[in-house]
From Swiss-Prot:
Record field: transmembrane: none
Low complexity compositional bias, start-end: 824-840
Gene giving rise to this polypeptide: SBNO1
Species this chain originates from: Homo sapiens (Human)
Keyword Phosphoprotein on entry: yes
Name this protein carries in UniProt: Protein strawberry notch homolog 1
Basic residues compositional bias, start-end: 781-793
High-level lineage: Eukaryota, Metazoa, Chordata, Craniata, Vertebrata
Residues annotated with Phosphoserine modification: S148, S162, S214, S692, S693, S697, S754, S755, S768, S794, S815, S1386
Coiled-coil stretches noted in the UniProt entry, renumbered to this chain: 843-870
Length: 1393
């Protein structure tokens, strides 16, 4: 059976980023169109730019099919105005030629015709059966009976954003006039005429096709009558996010020491029955060394490991427990369970070597003292079981992800760590492999054109080579980010015998459907017994938001820094143009530039809070608490550079911010240094030079010589890497990388340009269509071989001299630059270079001199600014809080700057006499836990997995106060950070203090995190919230609404779009003009050199990039811009709600005052890989109105002066609205509103707003209006009630807005196994982008149901599909039962016992 595809036109336009509301831009003049002449096959013209991006056309170019010569039928009613671009695109694309036809493209205006042939090879199928029966204008394409493998979306033909580009153009005057949208009957080629009414078409398209919010939808600014919509703004309540957790099916073990919660969607799904009996000793269970919920995870993991996937691999298990629940002990328990069953070898992978000690502690704590843990990086290359490796035959091998790709230079049979491990395990290995914190293994599912890293490939290979291994994945963000699941192939969600053939199919399906889809996946996994996810409740935790006011002098300094960066950006651009830098060098240079830009301003933001943190920390210590301060980065690299420059001497704390900019200018400013050039060409210039500048102090010279070789190879390597990926993970280096396991916490090494979430820049995201030999990722692979060859290649000095002379550089003795280390023009020596490629380095002497001068000027300006720049935050904090003897530092840096007793400043190593560097953090942690030090400073990279809670087993049981200087703008990551101090088995819960400045939306980040903490049970200190509770804090930015709002903001600033909201009223000056200038300064708006036209950066709607970049704008500007963005986001969300397209994640029905009844249920068997699952389709009716009797009961209990019945001032359709209001917050004058048709409203109203629209009346006056609306809302929608008619109803569609009683169809159970069927039906009936809305119900008789809402018009096709699947599945079950009778010993049989 060919699966129904999607509607061609809508799939193409919506997925190419065109608003569905814009599609039907048909003017009244379009209505009277003639019936086309009865020609056998009339072919409409197709614009070239809609098919091929490569040809840049100023105007859309018609395409004609050959050899067809029949002219387009004339129109009776020709419009006077040229059609809008959208109408034009709509009509053109609606008549694409059939599959396989050859199109010849012709440009009409010029005399000479340029021809280009293109063949359409793929087309989308639509089936007649899925058409709605209502006579309404539909948009359908000619159907072709293409085989299913050819079903692709038209966006594959429309490369990149060609349609978007087309939308910006005005259609040429001589384009083909639009014709009525027609559906062609394939059987006889005749064309049926259909009505073309603008309003109807728009209504139809909105309802039937695009029930979701298109990512780039332009929301009209026109405000409709807001009364009816407002009533229905939030139709269903949000589910409370978390529910108390207790194991349901397993009754062994003691209660967990702390309260644990689970997301509400997961809590309403029950896991499978337990049939596995654990072998763990009763002593361990009775003593509570493993709690009930840890034993539950161990049991389900062991049970899941007894089943096999359809491809023959053993099934895996995913532990999604949050920070602090005790994942470590659970994993230790799984290893112990298998050890007791004679599976005595196990592999445990994690992110840091320090966690090995935790692994040993966990095994010891559960009574498994005899299981030894060995570090992989301590083994020599060779057999692990051999004598020189201590004959290790059993136990746990602990390794980091980066050590997994370690490789020995000496060769031999086991020269890679992976081969060592595979040999140690053996082919039939059926022991445990644990991937702990598996979301941290870098870049397993790469974005754009990049390749997966070696780590990712090694992890996959390990699983593929050991198919019988018992795999356990552990990750707190397990199933919240689908891309993190890239190598969880043992879950059996994709691959053979599942709805998704490849991981990429799974990702596409899930990401297209939004938040809801991932919830469905998680619920399905729990239902099948392969996933468990609990989180520590934050009950008892308190938090406060501490605002740090910026002083005038600080704002002044910040604005000066902004101006310097704007100048720097211009100079970099000018110098690159001067020396005619090639494209790839520029790409690398800008990558470094923006990366440094982001770090510079992050350092400035953090530095503004140091004084306040010190003050707060001292107060808390006096109050008998202890303090943990969280930092993201340490700035160590800057300190080392300053140290080297000063020849090992320092006279003050190093300014990290200054170091960032100085390093950028010195290393990456595009001014070729001839000294460096000579070195690269192999000319020995070690002889001392008279020209060396005062900067090159004698004590530095040796260091420079010593490092010259490294420097050159490093710079040359950078050049090859193109993106200057200095911090990209050591995964790609291909050499032994155990040394890098310490996870340097400095921003450069952990974050700088690695492919993580914080990327401000990825040079490969623009997917330039370079050939493979130019692919920098491939070049990097071959880099080592090339380097070896290069070393041996000698260079003829004469040829160099002649080349230098020819370019005007060789005539004089080379004058050395004032800066010792400057990157050569990157990529000047690509892997396949020949001597000609050096010419890109050698530019005219004049240009080089000017570029050098610019560089010197920039460095001088920086020196002036440096006087005001703040010092390194970490060093300053430690110094202010009493020095290293009072502060436990847990970071990845090797040394620090301290102030001595005599006031001098010096650099000292962090290592101590009796403590090796590798266990320094562990030692510092112990000092803190023992109470020797009461302040701990942790950096994010070094702290993963470190426990600092007020543990019952620790000496230091003071209450922890956790202060964060830098909040991540994702609530999930913030919760991860707080997991350091809030963990199981604590005496007291911690307090959190968020320090926020008034810079770019830090308040908003804080309120998002605060909202999440509240939903987890935390309390605020009093009522001092930085943001009012009615604020948008519950909306995260980084979602489709945020991206859409940002797109509208950016387009309105460059006048591509009209603004949705007015700019902040209190902004002094011309908002749009100033902000435009500011955004040009931070590179989010580009100015075309010749024309001066403004264009948006390619990633202009990337929220992360936007929030990072606007820090580089002046303080008042960035705040005004952020306010404007937040206001636009509010408007976008409100519009989405009004259009019924707001994706609220999971919705709750039946938790409030609604009455939920189950009226029907259909059950279907589905194909499941381990057990035969089933899905149920429930028909649910929900009554949510409020009768007059109920209203008067509430009214009788009201006491407030403003409580009572109100009537609307406005009369519509001879009717007034009656409402009942009750004051809930006298201080803020917030009121709860009840309505006759929709009952209690979620949104609280401000009294001032109520007074504008309503007046207070006595109950008798409200009675008639209340009853009138209550009775009519049983079957009349709001539109019909208030306006007398409903557009939807007049088209024969069902409108449920404002109805008192509504019907929902909910699909529950193993939805994942019928995903493709559901997708197919939703797509064919309701368009490609319909959102998957998850709902949680509690019926009147107490039954809980969680599932997917199926739109009414999809129910009957879905039932037909599931019925056929059900019959075939029943047959399969009977065959399976027969087979099991003949094979009673099978594992599968056992698993179903």
């Amino acid at each position: 059976m060919v699966e129904p595809g999607q509607d061609l036109l809508l799939a193409a336009l919506s997925e190419s980023g065109i608003s569905p509301n814009d599609l039907f831009d048909i003017d009244g003049g379009d209505a009277g169109l003639a019936t086309p002449m009865p020609t056998p096959s009339v072919q409409q013209s197709v614009p070239l730019s809609a098919l091929e991006l490569g040809l840049e056309t100023e105007a859309a170019v018609p395409v004609k099919q050959e050899p067809e010569t029949v002219p387009t039928p004339a129109l009776l009613n020709v419009r006077q105005q040229p059609p809008s671009t959208t109408t034009f695109v709509l009509n053109q694309i609606n008549h694409l030629p059939p599959l396989g036809s050859t199109i010849v493209m012709t440009k009409t205006p010029p005399v000479t015709t340029n021809r280009q042939t293109i063949t359409l090879t793929k087309f989308i199928q639509t089936t007649a059966s899925t058409r709605p029966s209502v006579s309404a204008p539909t948009v359908r394409n000619a159907m072709t009976s293409a085989p299913s493998k050819d079903q692709v979306q038209l966006k594959d033909l429309l490369k990149n954003n060609s349609l978007n580009e087309l939308m910006k153009l005005k259609p040429p005057a001589n384009i083909a006039q639009p014709v009525a949208t027609a559906a062609t009957d394939v059987s006889n080629g005749t064309v049926k005429k259909e009505s073309s009414n603008k309003e109807g078409a728009r209504m139809w398209i909105n309802d039937m096709k695009m029930r979701s919010f298109s990512p780039t939808m332009k929301v009209p600014v026109v405000k409709e009558d807001d009364e009816p919509e407002e009533e229905d703004e939030e139709e269903m309540g949000h589910a409370e996010t978390y529910a108390e957790y207790m194991p349901i099916k397993l009754k062994i073990g003691l209660r967990h020491p702390d309260a644990v919660v689970e997301t509400s969607s997961l809590s309403s799904v029950t896991p499978p029955d337990v049939w596995y009996k654990t072998s763990i000793s009763e002593e361990t269970i009775d003593n509570g060394w493993l709690s009930a919920l840890q034993l539950e995870a161990i049991t389900y993991a062991a049970q899941q490991h007894e089943t096999f996937l359809p491809n023959g691999d053993r099934a895996g298990f995913l532990i999604g427990d949050g920070a602090g629940v005790g994942k470590g002990r659970t994993i230790a328990g799984i290893i112990y369970e298998n050890y007791l069953l004679s599976r005595k070898r196990a592999l445990w992978f994690s992110v840091s070597n320090d966690l090995k000690y935790d692994a040993e502690r966990d095994l010891r704590d559960i009574g498994a003292k005899n299981i030894l843990v060995h570090s992989l990086n301590k083994f020599k290359y060779g057999k692990i079981s051999s004598k020189h490796n201590g004959s290790v035959k059993k136990g746990v091998i602990f390794a980091t992800y980066s050590s997994l790709i370690g490789e020995s230079q000496s060769g031999g049979k086991y020269k890679t760590r992976l081969k060592q491990l595979l040999h140690w395990c053996g082919d039939d290995f059926d022991g445990v492999i644990v991937f702990d914190e598996c979301h941290k293994a870098k870049n397993l599912c790469p974005v754009g054109s990049s390749k997966p890293t070696k780590t990712g490939l090694a992890v996959l290979e390990l699983q593929n080579k050991l198919p019988k291994a018992r795999v356990v994945y552990a990750s707190a963000t397990g199933a919240s980010e689908p891309r993190n699941m890239a190598y969880m192939n043992r879950l059996g969600i994709w691959g053979e015998g599942t709805p998704f053939r490849e991981f990429s199919d799974f990702i596409q399906a899930v990401e297209r459907r939004g938040v809801g889809a991932m919830e469905i996946v998680a619920m399905d996994m729990k239902l099948r017994g392969m996933y468990i996810a609990r989180q520590l409740s934050f009950t008892g935790v308190t938090f406060k938001i501490e605002e740090v006011l910026l002083s005038q002098s600080y704002v002044k300094m910040y604005n000066k820094a902004v101006k310097l960066w704007v100048i720097a950006r211009e100079r970099f651009q000018q110098a690159a143009d001067l020396i005619d830098a090639e494209q790839r060098m520029k790409k690398s240079m800008w990558g470094q530039f923006w990366s440094a830009h982001q770090r510079f301003f992050k350092y400035l933001c953090i530095a503004s809070k140091v004084k306040r943190v010190v003050q707060l920390a001292r107060e808390e210590i006096k109050n008998g608490k202890c303090v943990v301060i969280g930092l993201q980065s340490t700035g160590e690299a800057r300190t080392l550079e300053a140290l080297e420059e000063g020849g090992g001497e320092l006279n003050d704390f190093v300014s990290t911010a200054k170091g960032v900019l100085q390093s950028l200018i010195e290393k990456h400013f595009p001014a070729p240094d001839r000294k460096k050039l000579y070195s690269l060409l192999g000319i020995d210039l070690t002889a001392p030079s008279n020209n060396s500048s005062p900067r090159d102090s004698p004590c530095k010279e040796n260091k420079i010589k010593k490092r010259k070789g490294e420097e050159i190879t490093r710079e040359a390597k950078k050049a090859r890497k193109v993106g200057g990926l200095t911090g990209s993970s050591s995964d790609d280096s291909g050499s032994e990388s155990d040394a890098s396991d310490n996870e340097e916490s400095d921003y450069e090494s952990s974050k700088n340009m690695s492919s993580g979430d914080d990327d401000d820049f990825n040079p490969f995201l623009d997917e330039s269509n370079e050939d493979d030999e130019n692919d920098p990722w491939l070049i990097r692979k071959d880099h080592k071989k090339n380097k070896e060859k290069k070393k041996k290649k000698s260079i003829d000095p004469d040829s160099i001299q002649s080349a230098l002379l020819a370019s005007g550089l060789g005539s004089k003795r080379p004058s050395f630059s004032s800066t010792p280390v400057i990157s050569p023009a990157p990529n000047s020596t690509p892997a396949n270079s020949n001597t000609n490629s050096n010419s890109s380095l050698i530019t005219s002497q004049d240009a080089v001199e000017r570029a050098q001068q610019m560089k010197k000027d920039l460095l001088d300006k920086l020196e002036k600014l440096a006087e005001d720049l703040p010092p390194n935050t970490l060093d300053e904090l430690i110094d202010e809080l009493g020095g290293p003897e009072n502060v436990a530092e847990m970071t990845g840096r090797k040394g620090r700057v301290v102030s001595n007793d005599d006031g001098s400043i010096s650099y000292e190593s962090r290592s101590e006499l009796d403590v090796p560097v590798e266990i320094l953090n562990i030692t510092e942690k112990q000092r803190f836990m023992d109470g020797d030090k009461n302040i701990a400073i942790i950096s994010e990279a070094a702290s993963s997995g470190i426990s600092l809670q007020a543990d019952r087993r620790a000496k230091n049981q003071r209450r922890r106060v956790h202060m964060t200087l830098e909040l991540p703008w994702s609530a999930d990551r913030a919760i991860q950070q707080f997991g350091r101090t809030h963990r199981s088995n604590q005496v007291t819960a911690p307090e959190y203090v968020f320090l926020i400045s008034e810079l770019a939306g830090e308040q908003r980040f804080a309120s998002i995190v605060a909202k999440r903490l509240e939903s987890l049970g935390a309390l605020t200190h009093g009522d001092r919230r930085a943001t009012e509770s009615r604020d948008l804090s519950r909306f995260n930015f980084d979602n489709k609404y945020g991206r859409n709002a940002l797109e509208i903001v950016m387009k309105s600033i460059v006048n591509l779009d009209s603004p949705m909201v007015s700019p902040p009223p209190d902004y002094p000056g011309e908002f749009f003009k100033d902000v435009r200038q500011g955004l040009i300064g931070v590179g989010l708006i580009n100015v075309e050199d010749r024309s001066g036209i403004l264009t948006l950066d390619k990633d202009y709607n990337n929220i992360g990039k936007f929030l990072n970049r606007i820090l580089g704008m002046e303080v008042h500007q960035q705040n005004a811009l952020f306010q404007y963005f937040a206001d636009t986001l509010t408007a976008v969300v409100q519009n989405a709600k009004k259009n019924g397209r707001y994706d609220m994640g999971i919705l709750d029905l039946g938790s409030g005052d609604e009455k939920v009844r189950k009226s029907d249920v259909k059950k279907f068997l589905t194909p499941g890989y381990s057990t035969s699952g089933h899905v149920e389709l429930y028909t649910i009716s929900v009554e949510r109105g409020m009768s007059w009797e109920e209203a008067t009961k509430i009214w009788a209990e009201l006491t407030g002066p403003d409580d009572g019945f109100y009537l609307s001032l406005q009369i519509r359709n001879n009717k007034k609205t009656a409402i009942l209001v009750k004051e809930v917050n006298p201080k803020k004058k917030l009121f709860l509103v009840y309505r006759p048709n929709t009952g209690k409203q979620l949104k609280l109203e401000i009294y001032a707003d109520l007074k504008k629209k309503y007046k207070k009346v006595v109950s008798d006056d409200a009675l008639m209006h209340w009853l009138d609306q209550y009775n009519s809302s049983a079957d009349t929608c709001t539109h019909a009630y208030w306006r007398g008619n409903c557009k939807k109803a007049s088209l024969g569609l069902v409108c449920e807005i404002g109805l008192r009683c509504r019907t929902y169809y909910v699909l529950c159970g193993s939805v994942l196994s019928v995903w493709t069927k559901v997708e197919g039906v939703l797509a064919s009936v309701s368009g490609t982008n319909v959102k998957m809305q998850i709902v949680r119900l509690r019926t009147e008789d107490g039954q809980r149901i969680v599932g997917l809402i199926i739109p009414a018009n999809c129910v009957s096709p879905l039932v037909n599909l599931l019925s056929t699947s059900d019959q075939s599945q029943q047959l399969a079950v009977q065959q399976k039962q027969l087979w099991q009778q003949h094979h009673p010993q099978s594992i599968t049989n056992l698993s179903n016992a």
